[in-house]
């Protein structure tokens, strides 16, 4: 009874040493988890149901009431602003580099998911780069695998500007276009799953496959670790975020409390744009290190 815990402790210590040696040797650890593709447990779902006042229903998901659609919600002006932006014109000035959504056709997603992804990334690009952008933007980039080779585990967007102290600052963004209007919120059930909730209808919302939950990928967590050394060469201050885009005319689902694996936080488009504008100095593109520009250019999917 005493030996087993001791053995487990030793095993954990050895594994951590092994992981550190792999990282020091340029090989990074994968954070993938089989649990992400499994249904969350009833014990983790129950507190979410209680928090949002979801009514019990024996026919629903894990004994809780479910609906197929939320109550809609108020629209926003994001799509209206985005419609005025000419990405080709911005690309001609070097402000937009790469094509939003490029490479999704080669992914394992369904045709509907690919179409939604391209639409969402294009909307994000136009909304973020509207007006007088303070950043250069890169779209649809290759990420790194465990051995720092180019990988299809991609990065949807990178925004780069200059802070008042002269340091380059970058946002690495994973765009998400999820079901629901502003009535819907996505809330962590655990570290790997989000539940979809209609606040007005006090119910979980089912997707087209009849699921009230969605799993989260550790890709941004992994990419953050793998890019760290390269970004340090150029003194880059980096932020790694998930950005949710409105799927239709009823506003954007609320994902502001959602946290992805590795502590990657989520924000909507107006919040991201406001953060960029508050951090970056305008008209400082020439101060962005040329080596950093070349590095990001080399990762663009064409």
Language-model segments: which ranges?
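Surface-exposed interaction regions that form or flank ligand-binding interfaces
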Residues: 1-153, 160-170, 176-302
């Amino acid at each position: 009874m005493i030996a087993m815990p001791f053995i487990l402790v030793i095993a954990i210590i050895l594994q951590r040493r092994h992981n550190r040696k792999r990282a020091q040797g340029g090989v990074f650890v994968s954070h993938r988890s089989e649990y992400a593709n499994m249904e969350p447990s009833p014990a983790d779902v129950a507190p979410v149901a209680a928090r949002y006042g979801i009514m019990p229903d024996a026919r629903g998901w894990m004994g809780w009431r479910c609906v197929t659609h939320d109550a809609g919600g108020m629209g926003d002006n994001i799509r209206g602003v985005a419609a005025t932006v000419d990405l080709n014109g911005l690309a001609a000035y070097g402000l937009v580099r790469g094509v939003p959504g490029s490479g999704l056709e080669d992914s394992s997603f369904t045709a509907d998911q690919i179409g939604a992804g391209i639409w969402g990334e294009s909307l994000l690009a136009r909304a973020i780069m509207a007006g007088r952008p303070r950043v250069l933007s890169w779209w649809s980039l290759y990420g790194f695998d465990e051995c720092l080779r180019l990988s299809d585990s991609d990065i949807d967007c990178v925004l780069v500007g200059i802070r008042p102290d002269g340091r380059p600052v970058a946002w690495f963004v994973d765009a998400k276009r999820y079901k629901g209007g502003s009535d819907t919120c996505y809330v962590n059930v655990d570290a790997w799953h989000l539940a979809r909730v209609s606040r007005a209808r006090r119910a979980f919302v089912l997707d087209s496959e009849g699921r009230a939950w969605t799993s989260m990928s550790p890709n941004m967590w992994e990419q953050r670790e793998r890019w760290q050394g390269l970004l340090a060469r150029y003194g880059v201050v980096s932020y790694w975020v998930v950005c949710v885009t409105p799927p239709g005319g009823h506003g954007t689902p609320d994902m502001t409390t959602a946290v992805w694996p590795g502590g990657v936080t989520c924000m909507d488009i107006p919040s991201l744009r406001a953060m960029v504008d508050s951090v970056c100095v305008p008209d400082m593109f020439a101060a962005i290190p040329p080596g950093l520009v070349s590095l990001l250019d080399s990762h663009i999917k064409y």
